[in-house]
C-alpha cells in the first residue's frame, strides 16, 4: 500500500492515524476545511509529534501533504488512492460522505478497478458501517454492485488520548499524544489485500474491543471529568489523583468490566490490568487534559448506546452491581458549562421537569425504573 487520503487534519488525525500511516511509509494526503492548516501542511510536508509516556520524545512525521476537503482535488486523490481514513468526529461523517461517493464514482469512471478500503476512525460503534450507508445515498444505484465488490468499509476501534495543543507552543502543526495507542480493525471487511501497518491490529471480533474501550476508557474518562468538576479540579490528572475520585472511577470500570467479562469472555486478571493501565494513563503528568473537554456534550454521552448508559444496561441484563455507574450518571447530570450548548440544555431540562423526566428523555431509561430512582437519590446527595 502506497497512498492514503485521511479526512481530518486535527490533533487526532495528525497525532494518531496519520502518524501510524506515515510511519509505515504510506504517503498521506490530509483533507480538511481549515485553510491555514491545509496551507501549512502542504507547504511543509512534515510536522512534529510529541509522544509522552514515562518519558517524552519528539518524532517528525514526513511524506505528508494536504488538500482542502471541499475541493475537487480531494476527489481526484480518492481516484488514485489505496486507502481512505477519517478522524473528523461522528457528526462530520455525513458531510464527507458525498465527497467520498464522488471520488468512488470518478475512480470507476477513470477505469481504476483496484480495491479501495475505507476506515472511519471515530469514537462511535461501527462508524464505518454508518459512513457506508451515507456514501451509498450519494451513489447512483447502478454503481452499488460494483462498490459492494471493490470497496471495503472497514469498522475500527481507536484509542489514544490526544489533548488540545499547548497554547504556549508557536508551531501550529505540532501535536502532543500519549505513548499508548490502539487501532483495531475488522479483518473480515477488507477488499483485496489486507494492509500491514504497524500499530493497526486485526481481529474477527471487533465488537468485543469496541465495547471494551467504550466501557473502560470512555466510561472512566467521563466519570473522572464529572466528579472532578464537582470537586473543582481543572484537569483529568488532578481529578484522578484525588483518592476518593480514583476509587469511585475504578469501581465504576470494574462494574462495566463485569459486563464485558460475561458478554465476551475476557480474562478477569487481564481486564483488571487493562483498568489499571487506563488509570495510569489518566494520571500521565505530561498530558494536560481539561475536565471540560472530556465532559463536554453530556447529552450525547448520556445516550443509550454511549459510555454511561450502555454499560448500565449491561449490568441490568446480567443482574450485576452498578452503584458506581449510577453515581457517575448522577454526576453527569450535575455538569455545568455555559459555553457548552448541551450542558446548558441539560441544566434547563433538570430545572423545568426534574431528574426523572430528564433521564427518561435523554437516556431511554424508564422514568419509573429502579435505576432512575437510585440516580435521583444520588443526584440529590452530590
Curated annotation (Swiss-Prot):
Belongs to the mannitol dehydrogenase family. Keywords: NAD, Oxidoreductase. It is an enzyme of class 1 (oxidoreductase). One of its GO terms (molecular function) is mannitol-1-phosphate 5-dehydrogenase activity. Its EC number is 1.1.1.17. NAD(+) binds at residues 4-15. This is Mannitol-1-phosphate 5-dehydrogenase. GO terms for biological process: mannitol catabolic process. It catalyses: D-mannitol 1-phosphate + NAD(+) = beta-D-fructose 6-phosphate + NADH + H(+). One of its GO terms (cellular component) is cytosol. Pfam families: Mannitol_dh, Mannitol_dh_C.
